[in-house]
Amino acid sequence: MMKTSAIHFPFQAPNTISLVAGTGDAKNPLNAFDMALLSSGIGNLNLIRISSIMPPKAEIIPLPKIPQGSLVPTAYGYEISKIKGETVAAGISVAIPKDKELCGLIMEYECVGSKKECEDTVREMAKDGFEMRGWEIDEIISIASEQTVENIGCAFAAAALWYK
């Protein structure tokens, strides 16, 4: 019989989270997305897309100086449109539990619509996620962006996790 052992991962849970948002408008979708990343402050990082869990006790801070090219765990949403005059939006929220031993929830949402509509929706999503778990919310923090399309427009919002 084969002996089993615990798997050890070289990763530690990040202990900070930064909410960022940006917009871009360019001649093609990828450059619009890249411009939105740059305007949010994380355009020179390698984003590793994660699901929507904030590690317990992680601290929400302004975006720190992260070395270019770093692999950064990130939950994000974005909306791209080619329709001139259309407004696109993206938002992200973080719900922090009253019980600090529990994880927080990160919710992302994108839409054709306004920044306000998007941010309201993403905050409701955070409330719903806590309700499904039977947890009490201490605080919800959110950010959103909107872009009215000229060429090809992109709205972007993210929660970048990092280490203190």
UniProtKB/Swiss-Prot annotation:
<dbReference type="InterPro" id="IPR016104">
    <property type="entry name" value="Pyr-dep_his/arg-deCO2ase"/>
</dbReference>
<dbReference type="InterPro" id="IPR016105">
    <property type="entry name" value="Pyr-dep_his/arg-deCO2ase_sand"/>
</dbReference>
<dbReference type="GO" id="GO:0008792">
    <property type="term" value="F:arginine decarboxylase activity"/>
</dbReference>
<dbReference type="GO" id="GO:0006527">
    <property type="term" value="P:arginine catabolic process"/>
</dbReference>
<feature type="site" description="Cleavage (non-hydrolytic)">
    <location>
        <begin position="51"/>
        <end position="52"/>
    </location>
</feature>
<dbReference type="InterPro" id="IPR002724">
    <property type="entry name" value="Pyruvoyl-dep_arg_deCO2ase"/>
</dbReference>
<feature type="modified residue" description="Pyruvic acid (Ser)">
    <location>
        <position position="52"/>
    </location>
</feature>
<dbReference type="Pfam" id="PF01862">
    <property type="entry name" value="PvlArgDC"/>
</dbReference>
<keyword id="KW-0456">Lyase</keyword>
<keyword id="KW-0670">Pyruvate</keyword>
<comment type="similarity">
    <text>Belongs to the PdaD family.</text>
</comment>
<protein>
    <recommendedName>
        <fullName>Pyruvoyl-dependent arginine decarboxylase</fullName>
        <ecNumber>4.1.1.19</ecNumber>
    </recommendedName>
</protein>
<keyword id="KW-0210">Decarboxylase</keyword>
